[in-house]
Amino acid sequence: MTRAWRQLTLLSLAELLALSLWFSASAVLPALTREWGLTPGGAAGLTIAVQAGFIVGTLLSALTNLPDVFSARTVMKVGIVLGAATNASLALWVFSLWPALILRFATGVCLAGAYPPAMKIMSTWFREGRGLAIGILVGALTVGSATPHLVRGVTALPWRETLLVASALAVAGAIVVQLWVTDGPYRFPSARFDIRMAAAVFGERAPRLACFGYLGHMWELYAMWAWIAAFLAASLEERGGGSYAGLNASAATFVVVALGALGCWAGGLASDRLGRTTSTMIAMALSGACAATIGFTFGGPPLLTLLVAIVWGITIIADSAQFSTAITELSPPAYVGTALTTQTCVGFALTMISIWLIPPMAARAGWRWAFATLTIGPALGVLAMARLRATPESAKLTGGRR
């Protein structure tokens, strides 16, 4: 194993462990709903609070050029440790919704230091094969996001202990960063603080179109991740019970989300061989089709529902890394970290709307139609990437493979 791939392995491990914080509360929502008497709005709020905190964290990071002015490694480990602390505080000392919302918001702010800086560190190790490398990193993020569902699905741990397990995993990730993760030989030039760069990185058409493609992807992704567990549980209830090939809804959710790591790997390979725009358009077309059709399996044969959900879980994340890779290839080198952070901030702002939208849609139109509202994202994303492909600047992508 080369040094670059060893570093990618370590960075991916750290990211997997750290991102277990993200959906830790979402994984225990049924228990929280029973104990605290949560309304659907309150349950959605616990997920949206993390998104909102992440947005604020990435916005502050972008406005201060934090990942370009300071060591991305330092930003990453500090963010992970603080996120673990806020998550553990919820488990240890919170007994009602509003303090939980505040701490979930704080966890989101801290996680802004875990994700974008990791992409920048990885980019210092890879020029060739960067799409595959970022794909593997996002795959680790995917498995990490699903981990609380695994803990909940295969153990009898109460919800507080489940959150503490997630915090312990995150601290282990910070230790990996501290002891073994380093910057690579292809370092981006240091930057001085310049508040204008947070917006200026998207002043040119090509990065802006890549960002629009990313927005379409994000409209769909986090709403699916947030509510697929509820969909799978409700589908079994509608049928009168049963399981997904012996798996309960929580364990099935872990399988659906975690298998997205395969999509990240395949998407990375396809992107480096076929080009960024081609691979992202294919992935969004497939995931959009799944969003449009999975509702028709609701209450039907569990294996059919699980199969469509797995295909959706794989294709919905397959393109994610390629939008980030495109930004690293299209943006000014000195401000790649700021560009990634700004893109991420805008994308996560949009997820708050789609996450909030699903519960009222499910209540009014039923689960059969709720996820269909997500198809607009990949449809517009395909259009944006097709327009990017037609620009002269797209020749910078993948060494000329658009």
Residue ranges and their predicted role:
Residues L16, T86, W98-G113, P302-A318:
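Hydrophobic core of transmembrane alpha-helices in multi-pass small-molecule transporters
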Residues L179-A200, S394-R401:
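Flexible cytoplasmic inter-helical loops of multi-pass small-molecule transporters
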Residues L274-A326:
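C-terminal transmembrane helical hairpin of 12-TM major facilitator-type secondary transporters
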Residues E128, I136-V181:
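Helix-loop-helix hairpin linking two adjacent transmembrane segments in secondary transporters
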Residues A25-S26, A206-A261, S324, S354:
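Extracytoplasmic gate region of multi-pass secondary transporters
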